Design a protein with these regions (language model features):
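Bacterial N-terminal signal peptides that target proteins for export
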Residues: 1-8
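Sec/Tat signal peptide C-region and signal peptidase I cleavage site
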Residues: 18-22
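Central antiparallel beta-sheet cores of small beta-barrel/beta-sandwich binding domains
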Residues: 26-168
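Bacterial N-terminal signal peptides
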Residues: 8-17
Length: 168
């Protein structure tokens, strides 16, 4: 009888230990790995179908990249425009960037990098950019208007993304 009791106690202890290890592993997977910030580098969706933002994380937390989008103005309607980052920073999972002004429009993003629904690195939506995007536009009279919205940009799958373009 003591032997059965002992075996039951050992089995219960091992089972609880396995549950704890599994819970800890899931908690770690849910958080982006701040030690491997380069993993955040990649191409993410942007506001419209066919538009994207390329994010490249450097060693120091400095972020470079660009937004590729369709023009909305009368002179650039439907044209594909690239807006390089004027500044960009990653601190832990806090991401911010501001683009150059192109045809009177610039973008400012402040938010976080978070784990998405992708199961493995390289899967679609493995990482997400969540935050507030502010679009500033100036007209011919230099009057500036700003529109701000909450956004979620999903990382493209690694095999489906074209190679990154280096900024010169």
């Amino acid at each position: 009888m003591k032997r059965i009791y002992f075996i039951s106690v050992v089995a219960l202890a091992l089972g609880l230990g396995a549950v704890r290890v599994t819970a800890e592993r899931r908690a770690q997977e849910a958080k982006p790995d701040a030690k491997n910030e380069h993993a955040y580098s990649g191409m993410y969706t942007f506001l419209k179908e066919g538009e994207f933002v390329q994010v490249t994380v450097e060693d120091t937390g400095h972020v470079t990249g660009f937004v590729s989008r369709f023009g909305d103005g009368e002179s650039d309607k439907g044209a594909f425009l690239d807006q390089f980052f004027k500044s960009g920073k990653l601190d832990g999972n806090q991401l911010s960037f501001t683009t150059d002004i192109v045809h009177g429009v610039s973008f400012d993003f402040k938010g976080t990098v978070e784990r998405g629904d992708g199961k493995n690195p390289g899967d679609e939506a493995y990482f997400l950019l969540k935050g507030r995007l502010t679009e500033s536009a100036s007209d011919v009279n230099k009057k500036v208007s700003a529109h701000s919205q909450e956004v979620v940009f999903k990382m493209f799958p690694q095999d489906g993304a074209p190679a990154a373009v280096e900024r010169k």
